[in-house]
Amino acid sequence: MSNSTDPSDYCTFEICPITEAYVYYVPSLAGNAFYLALFAVLLAAQLVLAVRYRTWGYLAGLSGGLILEIIGYIGRIQLHSNPFRFGPYLEYLICLTIGPAILSASIYICLGRIVIVYGEGISRLRPKTYTMVFVACDLVSLVLQAAGGAITSVADADQYDLAQDGINIMIAGLASQVASLALFMALCLDYAWRVYKSPHNLSPETRMRDLRHSLRWKAFLAGLALATVAIFMRSVFRVAELKGGFHSSLANDQVLFMTLEGAMIAIAVIALTVLHPGLCFDGLWDQTKWSFRRSRDSEMQLIEVSAGHEAKAQRADLGMS
């Protein structure tokens, strides 16, 4: 609803029932303050780690998403004192809806680098293709969710069809995010299977091989998987929540929201911070960066390394004969 019908113009707890508020409950001050503080700390940690390890692309998605999470929980804290206010409700609704789509971009850029660590030859797609395709999907999801939120926000109370159109567009955006995350997980599993089946076709570069065998690397992969699954679960929940509309019982269940929205995103960002690629790539984050110009160079370097190994093996065979 637009602010022309804002219940805060005439409603207080003493005058209006909670069913006239934008959410049918009083948001928990302690719970929302906890998430606000947690995401603020994680944002600061991400900034420090980015400066230390120069992981600017990784920072972009996480910082953008975390800023939106912080704004969203500020809105929910404001709703604690007055759930009839439209402004804080809009802050919470839009920011917490689109924030995870931006967070997902940081996950997507990691897959291309993981492919370089293991070897491009066994991948179905080039490293840059993974990043470009999924970031593009993320952008589509983001635009749909933002557009749906904007349409819903300007609909007056008597413009049910317009409000429902906005909700449907938001659902489409969230559904596209679920679909892209599902495809991303499927391609990750496919690549993992190819790595498992082709251990002799992995990148022969010594530093890449050592990185693959390190405990920190394995922990990084586990953390990335955990973050992906957590955001996926959250997105499925939000699709189901919006499917019933803003006045459904699911959309007004605070415990479910704090668990399947707040906790899932918290788990994801904690994993993406504690197991930061700057800490787990052993100084190879920049070396695994692709670009249109360097993609071919990387392939030639791997070919040269492989040729060097073959030449050494041939010399060894000649020496033995």
Swiss-Prot record:
Membrane-protein topology = Multi-pass membrane protein
Cellular component terms per the entry's GO annotation: fungal-type vacuole; plasma membrane
Q: Which domain of life is it from?
A: Eukaryota
**InterPro entries to which the protein is assigned, alphabetical:** RTA1
Asked if the keyword Zinc belongs to this entry, the reply reads no
Q: Keywords of this protein's UniProt record, alphabetized?
A: Cell membrane, Glycoprotein, Membrane, Transmembrane, Transmembrane helix, Transport
Which residues are noted as glycosylation sites?
Answer: N3
Transmembrane intervals: 31-51, 55-75, 92-112, 131-151, 169-189, 217-237, 255-275
Question: Which Pfam family is an annotated match for this chain, by its short name?
Answer: RTA1
> Where is the major localization of this protein?
membrane
Protein's cellular compartments: Cell membrane
Specify whether Glycoprotein is a keyword of the entry: yes
Say which family it is in: Belongs to the lipid-translocating exporter (LTE) (TC 9.A.26.1) family.
Job description of the protein: Efflux pump that is probably involved in the efflux of himeic acid A, a ubiquitin-activating enzyme (E1) inhibitor.
Protein's name in the database: Efflux pump himE
Q: Which gene encodes it?
A: himE
